[in-house]
Structures are given as C-alpha cells and as structure tokens.
Amino acid sequence: MSSPVISPETKTGKKILLAAPRGYCAGVDRAVETVERALEEYGAPIYVRKEIVHNRYVVDTLAEKGAIFVNEASEAPEGANMVFSAHGVSPMVHEEAAAKNIKAIDAACPLVTKVHKEVQRFDKQGFHILFIGHEGHEEVEGTMGHSVEKTHLVDGVAGIATLPEFLNDEPNLIWLSQTTLSVDETMEIVRELKVKFPQLQDPPSDDICYATQNRQVAVKAIAERCELMIVVGSRNSSNSVRLVEVAKQNGADNAYLVDYAREIDPAWFEGVETIGISSGASVPEILVQGVIERLAEFGYDDVEEVTSAAEKIVFALPRVLRHKN
C-alpha cells in the first residue's frame, strides 16, 4: 500500500481522513496475481469464471492483458486454461470444468475455502447449517453448493421467517456466514436466530475475514469525525457496500460508494470540512490516490492517515503456480 502525499500544513481548513487499513486484502492480491501469473506462464487467453474480484478496474485491466471473463465453465472451449474467482466455487463447477477437460486453477481465498471445509465437516456430522449471507453472491452460491440438502440461507433478519419449520425441532443446528458481511449486522442476525432457535450452536471461529473486520473498524475510527465518507469500490462488492453502511451507522452524515474519482459529485462538499476515505478489499491503491487528487482540486489538501491495525498476512499462490516464481 503506497503512502499518501501529506501536505505540511492545512491551507483551507478542509481535511481528508484516510482510513487504514484499506484496499487489497491478501486473498484479493493472491487472486489477481494468479491470473497475471497464469497469463505469463500459459499465454492468453486465460478464461476466468465470473469476475476474479468484484472491482471493475481490476477486471478491465486483466481483460486488456488477455483474460476472458465468462459466467460459467461451460462457456470456455474444450481444454482451456481457466481460473476460478476469489469467491470460491461449488463441487458442481469443478465437475463442469473437468467434463470439458478444462485445466482449472482455483484462486478461491483460503478464508473462503476454510468455510467450505466447515460446511463439509458439519454436514458429515449431521448438522443443518444456517448460512448468513446475501442471496445471489458468488461466495454464497459456492459455499452452499458444498451442502445442498442441509444448508439454509439467511439473508438478513427478514430471511429468518423463510426458514423451514422442521428446523425448530432440529437438535443439531449451527450457523456460519459469508466472509464479507458487516460484523455488527451479522451478530444482530445471530441474536434473532437464537430467539427462534435456542438450540443454535456457534461455530468454533468467526467466518468474517480479518480484512473485512479491519476495514470496518478503520471506518468506525474516523466516521464520527467526518461529515462525508467516500468509499472506493464497486457496487457488486459486498465488503465495499458494507463500509458505506458502517460509515453511516457510526457518525458520518453522508457516505457514498464510487468506482472512480470522476464519479464524485462536487455538490456533496457543501458544508463539509472533513472527508473520510476508505476502499474495499478488492480496490487497488491507484484508485484511492485518484480520489485524493480529485478532492485536492476542491481545497481538501490536508491528508491524515488514521491507522487502526497492521496487516502482514500473505497467502501463497495456488500450488500449480508456486514453482513458477
């Protein structure tokens, strides 16, 4: 993560608070590097199932280098080289790829893979799993595909009412969650679930990933000091959307999600002295720097980085690419 250029003095009274940590997490870094390394090693095209990460800039940049993004493995030609996205896939997707002799490289975040293994383990132990997540998200689809019969989606507190009645009498009941949710919202859902299902068990460890939690804590640390929060991230990025919600819930008067600096509306600045900036876990730092430069045009030329945690986690590349270093 490159450091922001910090002006030596406040010239206008207008200020930027820059949340840290922000941007790329270890899982995203690994996934993007997997596609880049595959392109170097095998040449273009490299097919990628779904968006490798939920960021428009990253996807467009990789496409320019020779990645071809498809919705399903079946759309790639026989024997193609394919990377599965950071969000993880179900066993059925692996089977579809194998049926076409596709050489698949799984770039699933290891923390998502951990949840897959938990689902498999609890299924074998006879548990029904209440999976807290957002319907239609690739991570949710991939995870639930590891236990189709015994995993039940809970999409928000409202989703509790849609759960099947037989679960009321199910003694072996446990909850798990998508890795990119709001920590506070997830705990609220768990509390409501335990009202309806007193027998509900907690998992051995929290599934919400370290990067998601750290970025939410970093936003909380500055939100109360900001009239406006700008989160850099794509609208299909669950963790980026959650950062906007966290900012609003913790003191920011307004919060907006932007992919690029050009999307910023100067009307947002009316009456605003302090602007907070953060970015989702799939956002490269170059996009944050673009926002800082854009705000400087409007007099926000004093930048203070507020650090709430240090991140040193690095994930190894998929095994097939490790010897290519």
From Swiss-Prot:
GO molecular function, one term: 4 iron, 4 sulfur cluster binding
EC id: 1.17.7.4
Manner of cofactor binding, per the entry note: Binds 1 [4Fe-4S] cluster per subunit.
Pathway(s) annotated for this protein in UniProt: Isoprenoid biosynthesis; dimethylallyl diphosphate biosynthesis; dimethylallyl diphosphate from (2E)-4-hydroxy-3-methylbutenyl diphosphate: step 1/1; Isoprenoid biosynthesis; isopentenyl diphosphate biosynthesis via DXP pathway; isopentenyl diphosphate from 1-deoxy-D-xylulose 5-phosphate: step 6/6
Keyword Metal-binding in annotation: yes
Sequence positions that bind (2E)-4-hydroxy-3-methylbut-2-enyl diphosphate: 54, 87, 137, 179, 237-239, 282
First-level EC class: oxidoreductase
The entry's keywords: 4Fe-4S, Iron, Iron-sulfur, Isoprene biosynthesis, Metal-binding, Oxidoreductase
Binding positions (dimethylallyl diphosphate): 54, 87, 137, 237-239, 282
Residues bound to isopentenyl diphosphate: 54, 87, 137, 237-239, 282
Residues holding [4Fe-4S] cluster: 25, 109, 209
Domain of life per record: Bacteria
Known catalytic reactions: isopentenyl diphosphate + 2 oxidized [2Fe-2S]-[ferredoxin] + H2O = (2E)-4-hydroxy-3-methylbut-2-enyl diphosphate + 2 reduced [2Fe-2S]-[ferredoxin] + 2 H(+); dimethylallyl diphosphate + 2 oxidized [2Fe-2S]-[ferredoxin] + H2O = (2E)-4-hydroxy-3-methylbut-2-enyl diphosphate + 2 reduced [2Fe-2S]-[ferredoxin] + 2 H(+)
One Pfam family per UniProt: LYTB
CDD domains per UniProt: lytB_ispH
GO biological process: dimethylallyl diphosphate biosynthetic process; isopentenyl diphosphate biosynthetic process, methylerythritol 4-phosphate pathway; terpenoid biosynthetic process
Record: active site: 139 (proton donor)
Cofactors: [4Fe-4S] cluster
Its biological purpose: Catalyzes the conversion of 1-hydroxy-2-methyl-2-(E)-butenyl 4-diphosphate (HMBPP) into a mixture of isopentenyl diphosphate (IPP) and dimethylallyl diphosphate (DMAPP). Acts in the terminal step of the DOXP/MEP pathway for isoprenoid precursor biosynthesis.
Assigned protein family: Belongs to the IspH family.
Stated name of the protein: 4-hydroxy-3-methylbut-2-enyl diphosphate reductase
Organism listed in the record: Corynebacterium glutamicum (strain ATCC 13032 / DSM 20300 / JCM 1318 / BCRC 11384 / CCUG 27702 / LMG 3730 / NBRC 12168 / NCIMB 10025 / NRRL B-2784 / 534)
Gene this protein is translated from: ispH
